[in-house]
Swiss-Prot record:
It is found in: Cytoplasm, Nucleoid. One of its GO terms (molecular function) is DNA binding. SUPFAM superfamilies: YbaB-like. Homodimer. This is Nucleoid-associated protein CGSHiEE_00780. Coiled coil: none annotated. Belongs to the YbaB/EbfC family. It comes from Haemophilus influenzae (strain PittEE).
Amino acid sequence: MFGKGGLGGLMKQAQQMQEKMQKMQEEIAQLEVTGESGAGLVKIAINGAHNCRRIDIDPSLMEDDKEMLEDLIAAAFNDAVRRAEELQKEKMASVTAGMPLPPGMKFPF
């Protein structure tokens, strides 16, 4: 049923992939991405774990209304999260490459 190497080989391969995924997740948590809004007037840097590292607001926005600034901050944060998730997908794809997965199954679980 499992061919040469059998179930033991499959389990070893799964364990190696799990170790690689854990290492990759640790690396991803250390990466930093920056999201922007308002043509770069608001920038938010987050790490791969989506923790905010920095917020940069152009001084010209301090004179504008509060609601607009809040919207720009939210948009920049959402952009940063989207970029972090894209980066995570790219990094994790290298770990799962070569291992056949059943249809619909994705890593990380």
